[in-house]
Amino acid sequence: MDTTRAKLKTEHPLPPLPAVAHRLLELINRDAPFDEIGAVLATDAAMAMRVLRIANSVALRGATPIASLTEAFLRLGTAQLRQLVLGLVFIHHFPRRGAFDYVAFWRHSLHVALAAQQIERRSEGLNNSGQDVYTAGLLHDIGIAYLNLSATTRYKQVIVEARSSGEPLEVVEQRLLGVNHAEAAAYLLEEWRFPANIIAVCRFHGRPEEAREGHRDLVRLIHVADELVWGLGYDNGAKRVGPEFNPQDFAKVRVDPTQHEAIVAELKTLAEQVESCLA
């Protein structure tokens, strides 16, 4: 990994995030109370308006519209608003470059985050915090966006070759770039001081058996959620075809496979929330 880190540091500069985005990530990562998060949000009018718009779309329908960040906090609670802010920071502040399909990428990522939460709630014995589950799902493929940003022309060739050959994306990345998106994501989140379990998800969600025992439950959960979302037809913007999902895979995360239809139905009700985040 030392050689990989050196290559990433030399050839793939960290994405330039606005100061407000860095501050929000810092607060979210240390589970800061919402009054601190709200104070920073208030300095970014566009972000604050997005939070209020989405909060109104997911709050109690028919209730009085939410008009302030404080009211959003009281109506939705700290956990849900923290998730909302995290998603908006990445979706609207992570730099975009080239012809890469960022909308498909973030749609896939948001669905994985929500799917992982639905699966985890039905699991018998998993002990991950809801925030960790959401964050891990949202960022599991962040290395794709990072490599596209830092090596746009070469990454376009990665996408073309991966689609035409049918090879796994990380295999083509390794051949053409000398690094893959799992390694890139781990490096990026280490530099941004994300928790070790989130970093482990980025590095190992494609091969959960390689994660260390303390992280394996969360890694396996995101692995299953990712396959479920691919099975629902949400590609990640880089490849259009992904792994097939078998409901029996729910057993890997201690969920009864008969819950498959209920989980899919719940995800369909959350589709509006996903599209609101992308708007």
Name each region found by the language model.
Residues 1-6, 21, 247-279:
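Terminal helices and disordered tails flanking the catalytic cores of nucleotide-processing hydrolases
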Residues 1-157, 162-163, 167-243:
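Conserved alpha-helical "signature site"
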